Amino acid sequence: MNGKYLQAPVDIFGYLALPKGQGKFPAVVIIPGSGGYQQWMQDTLANRLNEIGIGTLIVDSFTGRGVSETATNQATVPMAASVIDGFAALQALAERPEIDASKIGVTGFSRGGVVSMFTQDRRLVDATIGKNMQFAAHLPFYPGCATTFDKPAPTSAPALFLMGEKDDYTPASQCLSYVARLKSAGAQVSSKIYSGAYHGWISDVKQVTYVPRLQVYSQCDLRINDSGLIRDINSGASTADGWGSFVAAIWKKCGKSGAHYGANESAKKESLTDMVTFFGETLAKK
């Protein structure tokens, strides 16, 4: 983060929902995936959290940028922009009188799960919002772990990674490797894999289908070093060579098109319960 994003601010949108009653509520920022905001996020996640006394803010990073989806080209909205949006949502919630600024967590799906994962890194926190604020809990649903920090510097906040056994878009194996490095760096982090679940198990898509247009980096191991450069461990390709050259190199080396997507009712039910338990214990417990 070099601060250049401050020179061209973008207005983004969010959907705020508060529990019944008054007082300073804990809250969770919800970051959508590559398909952008969808109503099931309010109906499925936000409502469940509101019921246990936790406010929610679903972030829409796409509409303000004139984008509807990023599944076919993730560079349409750079991941760094979505991470900054996540921190901006934290700041916006912290300023509201109804919210307890010390008890704001974050969750997200796929691309949004990456935001939930990356916002746990102390270097990004300090560079973006300073040393006096951070998310209090992180819960990424099936995040993309092809690109991770080589030497993580986690905050003190707890994290829970939720992954699907049969996910061939953002496979659990990549995230388990990163979870191990996070633990070695001192993070309070755990993980859970749901049997039989493909990518998108919590969505409102009822049937698992093969989606040929998805960009998949399931065989990549891309590491962000302490200077912020990304390097492919296998090929040696680096963003030091220029972003365009790097993307072309890793696509040729480890990229492919097509993966499965769709809901799994058993995993959906179980993971919603796990989400409520996690945020209930980390944010709502008196």
Language model features: what each stretch is:
Residues 14, 24-33:
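Short beta-strand element of the alpha/beta-hydrolase
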Residues 171-181, 206:
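Short alpha-helix in the alpha/beta-hydrolase fold that links the catalytic acid
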Residues 34-43, 47-51, 58-81, 119-127, ...:
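Cap/lid segment of the alpha/beta-hydrolase catalytic domain
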Residues 1-23:
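N-terminal cap/lid segment of alpha/beta-hydrolase-fold proteins
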